[in-house]
């Protein structure tokens, strides 16, 4: 799966059988395993605009409306030899997952990137653990801003080949004198915590104040990437609203509150971090 693809001509990685959980059972604990053939593709502006925009909106969560997501999708699609999509049933369908990187310095004057950089600097300044990120982004260095997102319930085993191919593609781009010689990689991600629903508290007034909720990762690989990071941590979304968890949850007993998350890794350590992700998720299977 980690085979490097030719840059001049798209060479799709062979389809991979991965088990996914089907949660449409009649009981909360009734899961069926479904075999799915995933296919890896380069970005294609002819077919990938809507799927790319949808996943980018999901990555930015409630703050997506702060940015021109159409312009961001176009920017991603403008460099089809960098990054990958994962699809089912052929290239013409929307992506189930994507991973790519944009050069913050090269694109800093373009509408989506300048707004995103300002946003990330402001968020980094709200958490002392993220302070190095604000410094790096404000320095004008060539930072590789990584966008990694996949549909909920997509298996984490898909992450290693996405990252491995990105490392290969960036290496080839640098050899071709393209502007991908980064000082750092900044991975934009998300975490979440389970919160006792405010509706439940109101309907069950005898309950005591909720205990501190645990923090969880949408992407398992983030925990591994932390070990190679200069800085990592959470930030609150600008438009967050805990009541949103009540409107989205249906039959769940717990609401879910998402947080933005950033991971900063020096470029020289990024290949080693990707290798660790491969080893960790391979061992977890």
UniProtKB/Swiss-Prot annotation:
The superkingdom of the source organism is Eukaryota
GO biological process: one example: protein transport
* Annotated region (Disordered), positions in chain: 1-25
Q: Which GO terms describe its cellular component?
A: cytoplasm; nucleus
Positions with biased composition (Basic and acidic residues):
1-14
Q: Where does it live in the cell? A: Cytoplasm; Nucleus
Keyword Transport, does the record have it?
A: yes
Q: What keywords would UniProt list here?
A: Cytoplasm, Nucleus, Protein transport, Transport
Q: Which cysteines are joined by disulfide bonds?
A: none
Per the record, the similarity remark reads: Belongs to the BCP1 family.
What does it do?
Involved in nuclear export, actin cytoskeleton organization and vesicular transport.
Q: What is this protein called?
A: Protein BCP1
Please report the organism this UniProt entry assigns to the protein: Gibberella zeae (strain ATCC MYA-4620 / CBS 123657 / FGSC 9075 / NRRL 31084 / PH-1)
Q: Which gene encodes it?
A: BCP1
């Amino acid at each position: 799966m980690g085979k490097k693809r030719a840059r001049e001509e798209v060479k799709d990685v062979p389809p991979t059988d991965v088990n996914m959980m089907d949660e449409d059972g009649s009981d909360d604990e009734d899961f069926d395993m479904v075999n799915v053939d995933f296919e890896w593709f380069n970005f294609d502006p002819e077919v990938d605009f809507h799927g790319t925009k949808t996943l980018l909106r999901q990555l930015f969560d409630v703050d997506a409306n702060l940015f021109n997501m159409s312009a961001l999708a176009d920017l991603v699609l403008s460099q089809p030899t960098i990054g990958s999509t994962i699809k089912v049933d052929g290239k013409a369908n929307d992506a189930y997952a994507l991973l790519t990187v944009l050069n913050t310095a090269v694109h800093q004057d373009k509408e989506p990137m300048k707004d995103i950089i300002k946003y990330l600097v402001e968020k980094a300044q709200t958490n002392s653990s993220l302070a190095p990120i604000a410094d790096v982004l404000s320095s004008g260095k060539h930072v590789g801003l990584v966008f990694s997102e996949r549909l909920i319930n997509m298996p984490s085993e898909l992450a290693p080949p996405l990252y491995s191919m990105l490392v290969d593609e960036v290496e080839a781009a640098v050899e071709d004198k393209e502007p991908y010689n980064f000082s750092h990689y900044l991975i934009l991600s998300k975490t979440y915590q389970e919160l006792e629903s405010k509706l439940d508290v109101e309907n069950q007034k005898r309950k005591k104040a909720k205990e501190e909720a645990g923090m969880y990762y949408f992407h398992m690989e983030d925990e591994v990437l932390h070990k190679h990071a200069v800085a990592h941590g959470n930030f609150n979304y600008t438009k967050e609203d805990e009541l949103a968890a009540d409107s989205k949850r249906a039959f769940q007993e717990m609401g879910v509150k998402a947080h933005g998350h950033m991971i900063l890794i020096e470029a020289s350590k990024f290949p080693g971090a990707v290798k660790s992700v491969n080893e960790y998720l391979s061992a977890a299977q």
